[in-house]
């Protein structure tokens, strides 16, 4: 009886792993900044810090994913502010939203993380930053949920700078 349950469990684990198209990496703000610098000269970057428990984050999330899929000069990077013990929940949500590639979950204390992402960020979620394609510098940032039109304006500016 134990062997069939083991095989069933292993099959489920392999199936779940095969369905996952996102690499969720627990890391600190310094490593995230280093990752973002790789896109300078190649793509504009939209960095979105969110959490599964944040209603405005969850509301705007599908729109951000859609923009990332639509606009080829844009790299969308998601950073979860959830706690380490929510790793499974975060990965499941990212897979539900069909996020691919690399996403991050913070693994440093809140204040160090906030200061490392942006010195003018007060910690409210969602938090969004746009980095210029050419310059690689921060051009625009905001706290809170915003409209698709505001995102599109910021993306266009980031692609051109």
Question: Which residues does each PLM region occupy?
Answer:
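Short pre-active-site segment immediately N-terminal to redox-active cysteine/selenocysteine motifs
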Residues: 43-45, 49-53, 83
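Structural microenvironment flanking redox-active thiols in thiol-disulfide oxidoreductases
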Residues: 61-97, 110-114
């Amino acid at each position: 009886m134990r062997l069939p349950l083991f095989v069933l469990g292993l099959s489920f684990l392999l199936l779940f792993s095969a369905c996952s198209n996102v690499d969720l990496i627990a890391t600190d703000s310094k490593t995230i900044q280093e990752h973002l610098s790789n896109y300078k000269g190649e793509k504009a970057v939209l960095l979105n810090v969110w959490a599964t428990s944040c209603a405005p984050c969850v509301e705007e999330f599908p729109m951000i994913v859609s923009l990332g899929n639509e606009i080829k000069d844009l790299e969308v990077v998601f950073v979860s502010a959830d706690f380490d013990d929510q790793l499974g929940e975060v990965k499941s949500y990212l897979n539900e939203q069909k996020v691919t590639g690399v996403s991050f979950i913070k693994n440093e204390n809140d204040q160090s993380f906030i200061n490392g992402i942006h010195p003018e960020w007060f910690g409210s979620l969602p938090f969004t930053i746009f980095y210029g394609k050419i310059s690689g510098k921060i051009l625009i940032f905001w706290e809170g949920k915003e409209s698709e039109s505001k995102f599109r304006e910021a993306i266009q500016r980031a692609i051109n700078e």
